[in-house]
Amino acid sequence: MAELPVAPFERILKKAGAERVSRAAAEYLAEAVEEIALEIAKEAVELAKHAKRKTVKVEDIKLALKQ
């Protein structure tokens, strides 16, 4: 189960055009987004370490998204 709250994902699905959203669908989307975000975060951390920094900066996230 995702650590992120499910309600924002229900809103995202409705904003995308869904009239109704099952809890399971919102939970599944939350899990998928969390997995993707974790991979981006891991890459950003590695980029910060490579730059000899302990702080992850916006540019690390941007670079991670490009990879």
Curated annotation (Swiss-Prot):
- Site entry (Interaction with DNA), positions: 14
* Organism superkingdom: Archaea
Keywords in UniProt for this one? Chromosome, Cytoplasm, DNA-binding
Q: Could you say which residues form the signal peptide?
A: none
Gene3D superfamilies assigned: Histone, subunit A (1.10.20.10)
Principal place of residence: cytoplasm
Any one GO MF term held by the record is: protein heterodimerization activity
Any one GO cellular component localisation term in the record: cytoplasm
The reply to whether Acetylation figures as a keyword in the UniProt entry is no
Where in the cell?
A: Cytoplasm; Chromosome
Ranges where the record places region Interaction with DNA: 20-22, 54-57
Report the family membership: Belongs to the archaeal histone HMF family.
Q: What does this protein do?
A: Binds and compact DNA (95 to 150 base pairs) to form nucleosome-like structures that contain positive DNA supercoils. Increases the resistance of DNA to thermal denaturation (in vitro).
Q: Which PANTHER family match?
A: ARCHAEAL HISTONE A
Q: Which NCBIfam families match?
A: archaea_histone
Q: What is this protein called?
A: Probable archaeal histone 2
